[in-house]
Amino acid sequence: MAEQLTEEQIAEFKEAFSLFDKDGDGCITTKELGTVMRSLGQNPTEAELQDMISEVDADQNGTIDFPEFLNLMARKMKDTDSEEELKEAFKVFDKDQNGYISAADVRHVMTNLGEKLTDEEVDEMIREADMDGDGQVNYEEFVRMMLAK
């Protein structure tokens, strides 16, 4: 499954994995998964977290290691983002729910994920997705960017 990923995708997933893996031990626990999900505005129960982990926990040790994480991500990408998932993701970034993602919105979410970005990096992210040049990202631009992987 993970064989279909590009080197760039694997590098991105490695970075995401290390955001989840707070103690750097090479495994994601339910506690670490819960922390990240809550920072994204989700509120999963302990049972839901265990379900998510056991879904991809090939060696049944109760945690997700990087190869298991890659398989999960490859599977998720194959399921191509449903309309509902895209709407949810957009809502996470659109903090003030005005229908646009601003640089401040991106900065806020990335900071909650523990990712410190420079103003230039945030502006670059907005520029890449901003088709009409208004300095922010609307839902259509967001969908186009997410499906352009």
UniProtKB/Swiss-Prot annotation:
Q: Which residues bind Ca(2+) 1?
A: 21, 23, 25, 27, 32
Organism taxonomic ancestry: Eukaryota, Viridiplantae, Streptophyta, Embryophyta, Tracheophyta
Please list the residues that carry the modification N6,N6,N6-trimethyllysine. 116
Specify the EF-hand domain's residue ranges. 8-43, 44-79, 81-116, 117-149
Q: Which SMART domains match?
A: EFh
Positions in coiled-coil regions:
none
Asked if the keyword Transferase belongs to this entry, the reply reads: no
Family as reported in the entry's similarity comment: Belongs to the calmodulin family.
Q: Which gene encodes it?
A: CAM72
Q: Where does Ca(2+) 3 bind?
A: 94, 96, 98, 100, 105
Named from the GO MF annotations, one term is: calcium ion binding
Q: What does this protein do?
A: Calmodulin mediates the control of a large number of enzymes, ion channels and other proteins by Ca(2+). Among the enzymes to be stimulated by the calmodulin-Ca(2+) complex are a number of protein kinases and phosphatases.
Extract one GO cellular component term from the record. Answer: myosin II complex
Q: What extra comment accompanies this record?
A: This protein has four functional calcium-binding sites.
Name of the protein in question = Calmodulin-2
Organism for this UniProt entry? Petunia hybrida
Q: Which residues bind Ca(2+) 4?
A: 130, 132, 134, 136, 141
Q: Which domain of life is it from?
A: Eukaryota
List every position bearing N-acetylalanine: 2
Q: What InterPro entries is this protein classified in? A: CALM/Myosin/TropC-like, EF-hand-dom_pair, EF_Hand_1_Ca_BS, EF_hand_dom
Q: Name the UniProt key words of this record, in alphabetical order.
A: Acetylation, Calcium, Metal-binding, Methylation, Repeat
Which residues does the record give as Ca(2+) 2 binding sites?
Answer: 57, 59, 61, 63, 68
SUPFAM superfamilies in UniProt: EF-hand
